[in-house]
A protein has these predicted regions:
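Membrane-water interface regions at transmembrane-helix termini and the short interhelical loops
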Residues: 49-53, 76-86, 111-112, 130-144, ...
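Membrane-interface helix termini and inter-helical loops of multi-pass transporters
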Residues: 52-56, 109-117, 186, 190, ...
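Conserved, well-structured core domains of diverse proteins
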Residues: 1-117, 124-128
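Hydrophobic transmembrane alpha-helices that form the pore/transport pathway of multi-pass ion
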Residues: 227-295, 301, 305, 314, ...
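Membrane-interfacial loop-to-helix junctions in multi-pass transporters
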Residues: 121-125, 193-206, 232-245, 277-283, ...
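Transmembrane alpha-helix interface/packing and boundary motifs in multi-pass membrane proteins
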Residues: 214-218, 249-258, 290-296, 381, ...
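Core transmembrane alpha-helical segments of multi-pass membrane transporters/permeases
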Residues: 136, 141, 151-153, 160, ...
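Long, contiguous bundles of hydrophobic transmembrane helices that form the permeation core
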Residues: 2-32, 38, 322-425, 528-617, ...
C-alpha cells in the first residue's frame, strides 16, 4: 500500500511539477557519481556558510551556478521522451561547459572586475554560453514560460534604432537607445546585476541552507510530528480533517516553498479524510491547494521569498517576517472560517477521538524537535548573528538533537541522504533564480522598470485603486505556471515600482505583488496546485480551481487591506493599533466567509450576503467611520441570524 501511494505521489508531481521529472539511473556507477557530486555541492555551501571558505562574491556565485548547471544536465533529460536511465551524449558537453564557466571566472576574476562590464571577446563567448546554459536548464526544469520571458527581455534590450543590434525602436513609453550583444552579455555575465545578481546570491546562501534544514527535519520525523499534532488537535472538531489539512499544509508549506509538492505530500493524507466525513471532492481538493499556497505566505521562510525581499529592499529579514505574519494568519483564518461554516451547514462531524493520535504522546515523543525551531527563531531575531550563520548553526543543532531519541535518530546514511536530497532540491530554485537574473539585468540596463511603472500608472489614470487592480492582474498573469521565487521576482520587478511611485510603502508593494503571484497557483486556467489536488481527490480540476478561489477570497482582499492600512503589517504603529487593525481585518474576513458560504447560524439570503460583503469592503480602509459601519454590519448580522436560527428551531420542534 505504501509503495502504491508513493508511486501515485511521484506521478502527480511529475504531471504538475516539471522539476520532479528527473532521471533514474540503472547503472550504479552513475548513481554513485551523482551522489558524490551532490554531496560536494552541499559541503561547499555549508563550508561557505560556516565561514571556513569565503571566495569573492562573483567567484562564489559563479561556482554556485556552475555546480547547479552541472547537476541539472546530469539529472534532467532534455525532453519528456528522452531516456531517464542514461545521460545523453550532448548533456556531457553541457556539463563540461557548466564547469568551464566558473573556472574561467575564477582564473580571470581580477581582469573581469577591472573591465567593469566592458567585456572582451572571451568574456562575450563565455557569457553567451552561460546565458544559453541557463535558459536551457530553466526550460528543462520549469517549462517554456520562464525562458521565453528571459528571451523576450533580451530581445527588448537589443532593440533600438540608435545603438541597438536590432535597429527598430520600441514604441511608446518603453523606448530606449538599444544595446549591442557584447554590452548586453557583459552586463549579464561580468557583474552582480545580471545572472550573478541578488536572486542567485539568495539561492546560494539562504535558500540552500534552509532547504538543507528542511531535508534534515524531514528525515528526523518533523513531517509526522506536524501531521500528528494537527490531527490530534483538530481532527475531532466539526469538519476536523479539513482543519488538519490547513494546519499541516501551512506548517510544511512554510518550509518547503512548493505549493504543488505540499499539496501532494499533505493532500495524499488529508484529502481522503475530508471526503470520508462528507466534504465534496472539489471542496476537499480546494482546501488542500489553498492551504498549500498559503504556506508560501507564512513566515518564517515563506518559500524563501522573504530572503529575496530583504535583499531587494535592503531591510532586515526579521522586519519581513514581522510584517507578513498577521496577513498570513488572517488568510488561514479565512479558510478555517469557511471550513467551519460549511461543516455546520452540511452537518459534518469530526473524526472519533479514539482514532486520532494523542497530542500528549506525540509531544512526549517529538518535543525535542521544537528545540531547533526555537533556536532558529532566537538566532534570526535576537542573537545578532547573520541569517546565514544562524541557519548553519541550526542545521548542526538539529542533527545533534535528533540523536536524543530513537524515534528521530538519524544514521550517517540518513544524514547523507538528506544532504544529497538538499542539493537536488536546490537545483530547480537556483536555476529559476539564475534565469530571473536575465530579467533583472535587462531591467537595470534599459530602465524598463521605470517605464513599466509609468505605463501602469498611466493605465490606472493615477488612481490607486485602479493601479492596484491592474497590478493584481499583471502579477497573476506573470505568476501562472512559475515557481514561487521567479514568480515573485518577475512580478515585483515589473509591477512594484508603479505602486511605490504612487506612495505605497515598498514592503507593502512587494507583499502585494507576492500574494497575487502565488494565487496564480489556484486560479484557473493555469491553477497547477488546484489541478494537483483534483488529481488526488478525483474532482473536476476546473471546479476545484473555482472553489479554491472562493476559499481564498479573503486572501484576495487582504493585500488591499495592508496597502490602504500599513498598520496590518505592523508598520508605523503601536501594539494597540496593531491589535485593532487585526481584529477589524478578522471581522472582515469572517463576513466574506459567511457571504461566500451563504451560512452563519442559519442560511443567509442573497440580500444579506451582499450586505455582508459590503461590510467586509468597508473594513478595508482604516478610517473610524468605515470601521464602525463594517463592525455594525457584523453585529447586526449576528443579531439577525440568531433570531432566524431560533425561529427555525421552533418551527422544527413544532
Amino acid at each position: 500500500m505504501a509503495t502504491e501511494k508513493t508511486i501515485d505521489q511521484k506521478a502527480l508531481l511529475e504531471e504538475f511539477e516539471r522539476e520532479s521529472r528527473t532521471r533514474n539511473f540503472v547503472n550504479p556507477i552513475f548513481t554513485k557519481i551523482l551522489k558524490w557530486t551532490a554531496l560536494l555541492v552541499t559541503f561547499y555551501h555549508l563550508a561557505y556558510a560556516s565561514g571556513y571558505i569565503r571566495p569573492e562574491t562573483l567567484r562564489h556565485r559563479s561556482i554556485h551556478v556552475g555546480m547547479i548547471l552541472l547537476m541539472t544536465f546530469a539529472i534532467y533529460p532534455a525532453f519528456k521522451r528522452s531516456s531517464r536511465k542514461v545521460i545523453a551524449w550532448y548533456d556531457y558537453i553541457l556539463m563540461i561547459l557548466s564547469v568551464i564557466i566558473p573556472v574561467y571566472m575564477w582564473v580571470n576574476y581580477q581582469a573581469i572586475i577591472d573591465r567593469v562590464g566592458d567585456a572582451n571577446l572571451t568574456d562575450v563567448i563565455m557569457g553567451t554560453i552561460l546565458v544559453a546554459l541557463v535558459i536551457e536548464a530553466a526550460r528543462r526544469i520549469t517549462g517554456w514560460a520562464l525562458p521565453v520571458i528571459g528571451i523576450i527581455f533580451m530581445i527588448y534590450a537589443l532593440m533600438g534604432a540608435r545603438q541597438g543590434l536590432i535597429p527598430i525602436n520600441v514604441p511608446g513609453l518603453f523606448l530606449h537607445r538599444g544595446f549591442k550583444w557584447p554590452k548586453l552579455i557583459g552586463h549579464l555575465f561580468s557583474n552582480t546585476e545580471g545572472i550573478y545578481g541578488t536572486s542567485v546570491n539568495v539561492s546560494s546562501t539562504y535558500i540552500f541552507l534552509f532547504i538543507v534544514f528542511g531535508e534534515i527535519m524531514n528525515k528526523c520525523g518533523m513531517g509526522k510530528f506536524f501531521n500528528d499534532i494537527a490531527i490530534g488537535l483538530a481532527g475531532h472538531t466539526k469538519g476536523g480533517p479539513a482543519k488538519v489539512a490547513v494546519i499541516a499544509a501551512g506548517l510544511l508549506g512554510s518550509i518547503n516553498g512548493s505549493a504543488i509538492a505540499n499539496v501532494v505530500t499533505t493532500g495524499s493524507f488529508t484529502i481522503p479524510l475530508m471526503k470520508k466525513i462528507g466534504y465534496s471532492k472539489e471542496f476537499s481538493g480546494a482546501v488542500s491547494s489553498t492551504a498549500s499556497v498559503g504556506g508560501q505566505l507564512l513566515p518564517p521562510i515563506m518559500g524563501a521569498a522573504a530572503f529575496i525581499m530583504a535583499e531587494t529592499l535592503g531591510i532586515k529579514y526579521k522586519e519581513i517576517v514581522v510584517a507578513a505574519a498577521i496577513p498570513a494568519l488572517i488568510y488561514y483564518l479565512g479558510i478555517i472560517f469557511q471550513i467551519q461554516l460549511r461543516a455546520s451547514k452540511d452537518k459534518l462531524d469530526g473524526m472519533p477521538k479514539d482514532q486520532l493520535p494523542k497530542v500528549k504522546e506525540t509531544l512526549k515523543m517529538y518535543w525535542h524537535l521544537t528545540i531547533p525551531i526555537l533556536f532558529l527563531v532566537y538566532m534570526l531575531f535576537f542573537s545578532g548573528y547573520t541569517v546565514i550563520k544562524g541557519a548553519f548553526l541550526t542545521i548542526l543543532l538539529t542533527i545533534i538533537i535528533a540523536q536524543l531519541k530513537k524515534e528521530t535518530r538519524m544514521s550517517l546514511k540518513d544524514i547523507e541522504a538528506a544532504f544529497v536530497a538538499s542539493a537536488k532540491s536546490t537545483v530547480s530554485v537556483a536555476i529559476a533564480c539564475a534565469c530571473v537574473g536575465i530579467v533583472i539585468g535587462v531591467s537595470s540596463l534599459t530602465g524598463f522598470t521605470i517605464n513599466m511603472a509609468s505605463a501602469i500608472i498611466s493605465l490606472g489614470g493615477k488612481s490607486l485603486l485602479l493601479t492596484l487592480v491592474f497590478t493584481m492582474v499583471t502579477c497573476m498573469l506573470l505568476g501562472m505556471g512559475l515557481p514561487s521565487i521567479p514568480a515573485y521576482i518577475i512580478t515585483v520587478t515589473i509591477a512594484a515600482p508603479a505602486l511605490i511611485e504612487l506612495g505605497i510603502a515598498p514592503l507593502a508593494a512587494h507583499l502585494f505583488c507576492f500574494y497575487f503571484a502565488m494565487f496564480a497557483n489556484i486560479t484557473p486556467p493555469v491553477a497547477l496546485a488546484s489541478f494537483a489536488a483534483a488529481g488526488i481527490s478525483g474532482g473536476n480540476p476546473m471546479k476545484t480551481g473555482i472553489v479554491s478561489i472562493k476559499l481564498a477570497l479573503a486572501g484576495f482582499i487582504i493585500p488591499y487591506m495592508f496597502v490602504y492600512n500599513n498598520q496590518l503589517l505592523l508598520m508605523n504603529t503601536n501594539i494597540l493599533q496593531g491589535i485593532q487593525v487585526a481584529i477589524t481585518a478578522c471581522v472582515g474576513v469572517f463576513l466574506i466567509s459567511a457571504a461566500v458560504e451563504g451560512y452563519f447560524h442559519t442560511k443567509v439570503n442573497i440580500f444579506m450576503r451582499l450586505v455582508m460583503l459590503a461590510g467586509a469592503f468597508l473594513l478595508i480602509d482604516s478610517a473610524l467611520l468605515t470601521d464602525l459601519a463594517g463592525v455594525g454590519i457584523f453585529v447586526a448580522s449576528i443579531f439577525i441570524q440568531r433570531i432566524l436560527a431560533r425561529r427555525e428551531a421552533r418551527h422544527a420542534a413544532a
